[in-house]
Amino acid sequence: TGYSQFSLTSGMQYLNMYLQNEINEIASLDILSTGKVPDDCNTLVITTPNKDFDDIATNAIMDYINKGGNILWLNSAIANQVDYTNVNKILATYGVNPFEVGAIRETDISKMVSQSPDLIIPEIQYSDVTKKIYNSTGVIFLNATKINVVDSEALSNLKVTKTDLIKTS
């Protein structure tokens, strides 16, 4: 709470409903008040930070990661390059480079909605994460951004495994 324009009731309400329908307990986290991620947190969801994390939040998230915690990072396209040192430090733990300015635009008209290159129908790759929506045509991305990761050798050194969940043209 406090680092993103999104919350469980604003911008993320559909994700919130979906996760609750899957019998998950969902709660906002005020990491500045607690100074840590709760021990019973199975997955920490981070949504498009609009300011850098302070040291308290960064240390709490890094501690959570180092204890084997799971992160679901959702990021929309950005219009201006920002230097979020602490956000980038957390991303680097997983071999993810800082997010770049710009949105993905589809070039294959058969994968667009209403011939709009900003409304993308991705190819969902099969995995444990996507098995319930694999072969679905109901997934559309708007304002999507590219995720750049380090090369395979660097990922191996970080002990990080990359799994493609979706692909676009």
Feature map (PLM): residue ranges:
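Short, surface-exposed patches at the edges or C-terminal ends of soluble domains, predominantly
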Residues: 1-169
